[in-house]
Amino acid sequence: MSNIEERVIKVIAEQLNVDEGQVKADAHFIDDLGADSLDLVELVMTLEKEFDCEIPDEEAEKITTVQSAIDFVKSR
């Protein structure tokens, strides 16, 4: 697992208040990790701060799983 993946998983676990063991690549934020729309907004803001990047709204809407978050951060 890369450093980026580890950091994304840690951010997601902390932001959604779940154990890092639950944060699997195919986990869906809402269906699997119990997030709501406010959680997702806060998660995007935290990822932007942690990785010093901007996530446009149209891209943020596509980030629905752990893997999609990892892929987005890696692409920046």
Curated annotation (Swiss-Prot):
Entry's localization field: Cytoplasm
GO cellular component, one term: membrane
Pfam families attached to this UniProt entry: PP-binding
Molecular-function GO terms, alphabetical: acyl binding; acyl carrier activity
Biological-process GO terms, alphabetical: lipid A biosynthetic process
Keywords, sorted A to Z: Cytoplasm, Fatty acid biosynthesis, Fatty acid metabolism, Lipid biosynthesis, Lipid metabolism, Phosphopantetheine, Phosphoprotein
Pathway: Lipid metabolism; fatty acid biosynthesis
Function: Carrier of the growing fatty acid chain in fatty acid biosynthesis.
Matches recorded under HAMAP family: Acyl_carrier
Protein name, per record: Acyl carrier protein
Species for this entry: Dichelobacter nodosus (strain VCS1703A)
